[in-house]
Amino acid sequence: MKKQIVLLVLLVAFALPAFAQRDTIRSNKNEFSFGYGYMPSSSFRWGGGLHYYPEMDYFGSFYATYTNRLTKVIGIGATYCFDPRILNYSEKNQPICRLNESSYTLMFHLKINWLNTKYVNLYSKVGQGIMTWNYHLIEYQPSLYQINMPSNDFIDRIDYAYQFTPIGIEVGTKQYAGFLQIGLGMEGMISIGFRYGIIDIDKE
């Protein structure tokens, strides 16, 4: 609960200057974004009772978002994230197992455009939702080491998901733009991608 309150307070702090903005230039009613994020929060969610996997061959989040702009400043939408990773576990340099794990996330988000120019857009975003994950254990050698794996019950594999992006930048045209954002959550600490906006014909 404290985490949700902190996210809300931070969002309001970033949103206040945006509400005073009136001379926005770029605005699409519907926007789609596709990105890749480095080090999503699912990659460091391990808690007490779970084993630590010191070697990670690969991790990162691939995500897609849809945003419906209520105004030129405020947009709401949904985000889907897919986070595959391969982890190796060893004891004293002796390989024990290889773990293929994936996370699947659905979040609803609020996006605030607090600076708009013809070719550059700055924004902040916050999202909350749920995450589920699964895993597949391969190359396991139980004779060397016994591993207490997480529960296979679906209800035990559901967790809280979030994304807080204090700063993001889009560079391009009203319809096509690349973006870079810095934040914390399921979209990664640093992420890059592409944004496509559907231009309203009646506004052209």
PLM feature spans:
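Residues that define the transmembrane beta-barrel architecture of outer-membrane proteins
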Residues: N28-N30, M56-F62, N100-L106, V120, ...
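Sec-dependent N-terminal signal peptides
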Residues: Q4-F14
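Short glycine/proline- and aromatic-enriched beta-strand/turn motifs that initiate or cap beta-hairpins
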Residues: Q21-N68, R195-I199, E204
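Repeated loop/turn-to-beta-strand initiation elements of outer-membrane beta-barrel proteins
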Residues: K72-I76, K118-V120, T173-G178, D200-E204
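Gram-negative (and chloroplast) outer-membrane scaffold detector with strong preference
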Residues: P40, G60-Q141
